[in-house]
């Protein structure tokens, strides 16, 4: 679906290229009409009676800021792009529409950042520096103290920007953030700066054959750990998932290859960018990654699952990475997550204590993932670590109780749905939390209260066709149906289903969802991705492997309860053939 962020950026791109407005007049006009229809315009803003409405800077700025609220991480880069492209007027006065970013604060010790309540999120330091400098270059602050501070820290913050730029040149290995930095530097007299040159090189190398760029270039760590998690649901030896092709690609035993690869991705030193402590994992194996909660939890879980598979298969040496090495890596990851936990009991993405802005706050899906990771290693010594894990899970459950909606749902942070109210995705969030609660309830009684409301929320949000969308009545998708189905099948597998969840309805819903998903598998539609990924600045992405991974996880979980789903009677047909 079209949205104001991408349309404004696309419209600005045509303005930035000399002659593009005239050469592609029809495209530019349609974009202006779309924007004007959604943000409003004044009658005198028409060029002539027969022309399309003109997008006025005040209306555009108001709409962009309203979309993102007080978080300047997203609104200011978009408006800076518009200013650099001449879409907010001409001359330095066009920059009055771009709120200044206090880039001078980047010169402070990094330990101060959380307390300073920066107007951008923890991972946006490059944007704070580069975009802040662009605004200062074109329209310095009227405040003499701020103007002097920015003048004095300009070189120092540029040096910091160079220090935190990864060797690939791409900040977070992401096109949008890197582009915002490059264009801001180039537009403020720094076109030949080393950061600019390395950023341009990254963008040149990452352009696709059709001339476009992907939002993210590499999610290798994330999709690998998600795949291992999905395979674990099948409850058969992982060694069975092999072939000559797989062994050839892995250079031998594929489990050993993945274990070794994951161990090499763990950060062994403080991260130069966010100053995260050692022990975490990023979403990618490329140098621009930053350790985060979701990927660290995913890696810790994957190591536990493969270690369990090795043990069950009674492998000799060479079947996997040494047990001691895996245990040490897992403990480091567990402690990294424990140290990341906020005072509210929830888990944020990158940094502890940066709770002023939404993308730095604790979130339900990240907290649920951390709970699963902690539970996977909760019985490992030493005793003091076990005690910390128990306390952390209890705190995380209290956080989940606090943020659960009245309808029983939870909202995730990094996933959304364009067809749902507020572009949220309660299906993703609720499914992830319900799956974690099914595992936590054996030790933590509080989980059952949350589980009843969460499970019933998933039951109530199923569509009439048997599938799920991002929320009730949103179009059903492979990803969301698989996520909901996996969670409900895990619920159905419980020997003592919590009172308040109707078993008959649960069984029928799982059966309907299974049929919906199997129909898509058999037709080949199960490989078609949906843009449920939520990137910074409310930009959307899809991942080709999501529907396949989530479907595998869901059907593996359903297979565990297949006997319960089978109809009564010796002559009954098998209802979920193929699952």
List where the protein language model places each region.
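Conserved small-residue-rich
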Residues: 164, 249, 312
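Surface-exposed extracellular loop regions of Gram-negative outer-membrane beta-barrel proteins
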Residues: 197-207
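Long, low-complexity, intrinsically disordered segments
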Residues: 573-579
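An alpha-helical repeat/solenoid feature that recognizes helix-turn-helix modules
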Residues: 1-29, 33, 37-46, 53-142, ...
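Edge strands and adjacent loops of beta-rich recognition modules
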Residues: 146-162
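Generic detector of N-terminal low-structure segments
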Residues: 243-244
């Amino acid at each position: 679906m079209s949205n104001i962020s991408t349309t404004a950026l696309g419209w600005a791109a045509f303005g930035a290229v000399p002659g593009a407005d005239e050469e592609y007049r029809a495209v530019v006009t349609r974009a202006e009409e779309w924007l004007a229809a959604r943000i409003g315009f004044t009658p005198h803003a028409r060029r002539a009676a027969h022309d399309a409405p003109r997008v006025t800077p005040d209306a555009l700025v108001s709409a962009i800021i309203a979309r993102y609220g007080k978080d300047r991480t997203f609104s200011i880069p978009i408006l800076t792009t518009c200013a650099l492209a001449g879409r907010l007027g001409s001359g330095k006065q066009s920059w009055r529409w771009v709120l200044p970013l206090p880039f001078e604060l980047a010169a402070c010790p990094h330990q101060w950042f959380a307390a300073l309540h920066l107007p951008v999120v923890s991972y946006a330091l490059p944007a704070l520096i580069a975009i802040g400098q662009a605004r200062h270059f074109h329209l310095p602050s009227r405040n003499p103290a701020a103007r002097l501070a920015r003048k004095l820290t300009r070189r120092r913050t540029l040096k910091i920007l160079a220090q935190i730029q990864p060797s690939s040149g791409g900040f977070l290995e992401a096109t949008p953030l890197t582009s915002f930095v490059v264009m801001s530097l180039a537009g403020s007299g720094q076109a030949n700066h080393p950061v600019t040159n390395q950023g341009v090189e990254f963008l040149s190398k990452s352009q696709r054959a059709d001339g476009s760029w992907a939002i993210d270039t590499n999610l290798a760590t994330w999709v690998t750990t998600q795949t291992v998690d999905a395979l674990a649901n099948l409850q058969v030896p992982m060694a069975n998932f092999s072939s000559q092709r797989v062994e050839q690609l892995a250079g031998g035993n594929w489990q050993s290859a993945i274990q070794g690869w994951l161990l090499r991705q763990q950060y062994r030193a403080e991260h130069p960018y966010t100053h995260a402590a050692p022990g975490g994992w990023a979403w990618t194996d490329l140098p621009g990654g930053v350790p985060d909660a979701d990927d660290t939890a995913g890696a810790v879980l994957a190591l536990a699952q493969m270690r369990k598979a090795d043990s069950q298969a009674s492998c000799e040496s060479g079947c996997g990475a040494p047990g001691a090495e895996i245990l040490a890596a897992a403990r480091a990851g567990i402690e990294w997550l424990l140290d990341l936990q906020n005072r509210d009991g929830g888990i944020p993405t990158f940094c502890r204590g940066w709770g002023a802005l939404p993308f730095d706050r604790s979130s339900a899906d990240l907290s649920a993932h951390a709970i699963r990771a902690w539970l996977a290693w909760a019985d490992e010594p030493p005793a003091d670590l076990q005690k910390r894990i128990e306390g952390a899970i209890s705190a995380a459950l209290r956080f989940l109780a606090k943020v659960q909606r009245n309808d029983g749902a939870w909202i995730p942070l990094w996933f959304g749905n364009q067809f749902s109210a507020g572009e949220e995705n309660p299906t993703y969030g609720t499914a992830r939390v319900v799956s974690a609660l099914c595992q936590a309830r054996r030790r933590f009684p509080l989980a059952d209260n949350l589980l009843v409301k969460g499970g019933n929320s998933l039951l109530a949000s199923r569509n009439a066709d048997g599938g799920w969308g991002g929320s009730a009545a949103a179009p059903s998708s492979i990803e969301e149906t698989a996520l909901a189905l996996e969670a409900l099948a895990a619920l159905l597998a419980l020997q003592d289903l919590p009172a308040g969840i109707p078993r008959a309805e649960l069984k029928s819903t799982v059966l309907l969802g299974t049929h919906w998903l199997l129909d898509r598998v058999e037709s080949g539609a199960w490989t078609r991705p949906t843009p449920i990924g939520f990137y910074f600045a409310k930009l959307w992405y899809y991942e080709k492997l999501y529907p396949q991974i989530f479907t595998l996880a869901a059907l593996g979980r359903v297979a565990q309860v297949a006997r319960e789903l089978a109809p009564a009677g010796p002559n009954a047909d098998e209802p979920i053939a193929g699952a």
